[in-house]
């Protein structure tokens, strides 16, 4: 789950699972959420690298998700949103098929057609899961 509220120059994110929110600002893209997955815990404690996580066979094993238990506490993030920032919300169907640096390049090359281009690239790369992409400019 990934509800977002934007009020003035603030963005409020509620997060559970492995869908992600990124902020693209000028020349970089930063992930604003942290996956609730087994593989993310391995990355966090230094057992595997981010590169190894991308190919890990258990990368879709969630540690926290809606519907798994009766009550789930979401992570809540508050971030600054400034003029010309781009917010990307996406499911793991995108991030499992396209590396972050390539996602950034696709968006920067053609903002107006970025959603179509991202979904096409993810499908061309195998499209193994549902692909959800929302871009806020």
Task: Tell where the protein language model's regions lie, with residue ranges.
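An anion-binding catalytic pocket shared by soluble metabolic enzymes
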Residues: 20
